[in-house]
Amino acid sequence: MAVVVFDSDVLIGFLNPADAHHTEAVALVRESLAPATRRMLSAVNYSEILIGPIKAGKDARDHVEAMLGHFSIEIMIVDMALARRAAAIRARTDLKLPDAYALATAIHAEHNGHDDVRLASFDKAVLRAHAELHPN
């Protein structure tokens, strides 16, 4: 089964039509809807996408949560293994911790038997770190 792990920037771009990456984000989300594809988001990255909507009010937050449910995006709970992996990535790279969690979630999925894992991110540093730390 294929897996798409979202970095928060893709879903923020998807939700905000004024975002510079909106069109590309919509395309990435649509591509992730292919049959037999799981969609994942780290709980840390979930909190990132909620910040703006929480500031905007309950309706905006509810809109985000409805979108996640509509597209069956699984929120991956941060357990000790994922936290250790994110910390190791953070220690070895210049990535900020939330970005390390996006990458750690993708690598975690790969280590748990998923052989077709894609990390959806607009952050070149995240994608570069993924290629360096976990080349396919």
What label would you give each PLM region?
Residues M1-V3, L103-N136:
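Acidic, PIN/NYN-like endoribonuclease modules and their adjacent C-terminal/linker elements
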Residues F6, L41, I77, L97-A100, ...:
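Short beta-strand scaffold positions
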